[in-house]
C-alpha cells in the first residue's frame, strides 16, 4: 500500500505513524514476530531490537516490482533487520529459478560472513 491507498480507506494519518502504532500494539500483546513491508523495517528496528521480522515483497534491483510499492532487494532487507525474507515471483518467474536463488543466497551469505 501507499499513502493514497491508506487515505482512500479513511485513514488520515501517515503510513509511518500507522505502522508504528500497529507494531507497538503487537508488541504489547506479546506477538512472536511481525510481518512487515520492506520499507517498514526501519520503524520496527527503532522500536525494538531482536524481534523476529518476516518480510514479503522482496524484489531484486533488476526485477519488476509488480504490485509492490514499498519493496526492497533481499540484501537491503537483511541489512535493515529482516529475520526472514519471503521471495516468490522473482524466483519462480525467473528463467533459471535455481540460479536466481543461489545468487540471492550467496549475496546474503557473503554479507553475513562480514558482519
Where do the model's predicted regions map?
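Structural motif
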Residues: 29, 80-81
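Generic hydrophobic/aromatic pocket-lining and core-packing "Φ" positions
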Residues: 23, 41, 74-75, 101
